[in-house]
Amino acid sequence: MIISRQLPSFCLAALFLSFSGGAHALAQPEQTRAEIRRTSFGVPHIRADDERGLGYGIGYAYAQDNLCLMANEVLTVNAQRSQYFGAEGQTLEQRDNLSSDLFFSWLNTPQAVAAFWQAQTPAMRERMQGYVEGYNRQLAERQVQGLPEQCRGDWVRPLATSDLVKLTRRLLVEGGAGQFAEALAGATPPGATAQAGLPAEHWQLAAARQQRFALDRGSNAVAIGSERSFNGRGLLLANPHFPWVGGMRFYQMHLTIPGQLDVMGAALPGLPLINIGFNQHLAWTHTVDASKHFTLYRLQLDPKDPTRYLLDGRSLPLERQTLTVQSKGPDGQLQPRTRTLYSSVFGPIVQWPGELDWDHQYAYSLRDANLDNSRVLAQWYAMNQASSVAGLQDSVHQLQGIPWVNTLAVDDQGRALYMNQSVVPNVTQAKLAQCSDPRAGTRVIVLDGSRSACAWDIDPAAAQPGIFAASQLPQLARNDYLQHSNDSAWMVNPAAPLQGFSPVISEQDVPLKMRARFALDRLSRMHKAQVSDLQHLVTDDQVYLAGQVMPDLLQFCEQDLGADAQRLGPVCASLKAWDRSAGLQAGLGFVHFQGIMQPLLQDPSVWRVAFDPKDPQHTPRGLAIGRPAVARALRESMLASAQQVAEAGLGSDVRWGDIQQVSQGGQPTPVPGGPESLGVYNAIQSVPAADGKREVVSGTSYLNVVSFDEQGPRALGLLAFSLSSDPASAHFRDQTAAFARNQWSVLPFTEAQIRADGQYQLQVIEEPRKGAVLARQ
């Protein structure tokens, strides 16, 4: 047991004197105190008597495990990357520092940050204040001991509450404006030479990152109700797919205020509450939804001046905002980098070469619904305390603070619920017909910016102007099952299709993702679902697409391959030997299956049975190898895969676990799973690395199954990328190794379970309560 009551006086002095701009602390009689109980894999169970103390423990524990990660993200959201690392450097998301800084200068203005802070409840302000104090205490202690190698620069500093606000606002716009940072920072009027555009390679990276958004932030979820669970109580699988590095990396923890709060699960960096988890009576999870959280507006420009636009026949000037960031030059000196950003009444101008061009006729404005969402923290605060599915649903209806995810939940009474209840622009089907550009389709909504009538509708019942009211959004309560894998709301349960919504909310009669078809197939055969049944959805690593196309692939292999027989023979042999899984022992056939099918999936004409909206669970399927064009495309894809495997130096005896690994910062650890497009429920995204290897970048993250009995929740789970991002930590890869072994652990929730854990350790932190750490401007 470790007891830590008081920082040395010199640490406290360094801690509080380091705040800028007159930040100060006034001693008060009470103490700020938290208990941090660590169990297996270092998971912190944080207990305090009040909100300030709970936040204090969260911030301290998080800094113990992820201090450098947090310091890096704080630098990013404060638009200071160029100042310390130069404009041409890159973020972890491969965004150039200058674009990142300009974007966050626009997003996190002092006015926006102050307004968000003022909108928070007193309880949430107390918890955020405590988080800052706890993080800063751990930072001061680590500075005395020596900071980790990754963050020993002068860019590492204490937190202020404004930093937590900025981190939260960054998370809010991940489903919208956050995907357009380069487009916002690089928007330039035609003919202007005052500010240079971005290099072509920056746009290529931005496009690739935008296309990967849904893959990096996907998810699976299954909620089983009383009719189909083994004991008549709720049963939930949470399987969010999120990045393994950076500001979207989940953190596992348990939060307790005796008599008031007892909740366990995972949270994103800087959030002092649980995003996905369970309490005594309720378990819930989220999946990234298919709803739109922003729209574009095509502006009709004034023919006389491309910095003016026509609205209802009137010529209006674009608003100009000058942003300046400091950039470190090759000589180490700081130089100001200035850009002018332009905005219409709808939002900032964005420019994407070849897609959203700013010429003398048109420009495009972006409007993100979550920019006005100051309810997000209050929303998860209420969800953490809900004691039933009905209570959870009521809180979401009232607050409407969920930014861009669906919610699936169960409770101990056997109720199951699905809600597509996020912040969605109020653009009805009728308004789309009147105002949208049909050439854009529904992937991105482009509205007519020349008419004020095309602005988002206002519903007095909604929590903020311009979004749909909760009553207009999809939701479904069932006693059998509900599932979701990032499709629309349409087929969460085929027995009760959710239909008739604006395409901005949810589409119908569109193909399901292979993961959803896999889940629906399994669920149709689960009559009394056990905990192990939900675990096996993930751990079996089944490649669902293989069952749909392998008979045709093998039939093609049995045909006369002509002059290509020598090159394609080994490909066909590996496919035949493959076990149709993405497990660590999967052979070379899985590598070839990926190489063959991923290009073919881009062409809907390859299917032998086309998609049928009346049978979405079973179509499309099969490969139309009898059609010459499809046979030719298949042959070319097989030859290309053979060439890629040869160039990578992969032998016939290679296993998937030899190829797909996580290696950054430590010894390589094999990782099971594969591309979601192939129907791998255990979705893992990896990118090519050296020597034919693949490095994991995102996918299965926090993973659990929660059931209930008379005593409360029973949870099994793990954090696939492990608790700490510090390579020196004992908890840097420990859960990743368990993930590779399909070894889930009991998540200790009760006091008895916590104290009985073989790795139990207690730390108490305590210090005199201070006044507010003033927000930096």
UniProtKB/Swiss-Prot annotation:
The keyword Plastid does not apply. Gene3D superfamilies: 1.10.1400.10, 2.30.120.10, Glutamine Phosphoribosylpyrophosphate, subunit 1, domain 1, Penicillin Amidohydrolase, domain 1. The gene is pvdQ. This is Acyl-homoserine lactone acylase PvdQ. GO terms for cellular component: periplasmic space. SUPFAM superfamilies: N-terminal nucleophile aminohydrolases (Ntn hydrolases). Residues 196-218 form a propeptide. CDD domains: Ntn_CA. It comes from Pseudomonas fluorescens (strain ATCC BAA-477 / NRRL B-23932 / Pf-5). The lineage of its organism: Bacteria, Pseudomonadati, Pseudomonadota, Gammaproteobacteria, Pseudomonadales. It comes from the Bacteria. Keywords: Hydrolase, Periplasm, Quorum sensing, Signal, Zymogen. The keyword Ribosomal protein does not apply.
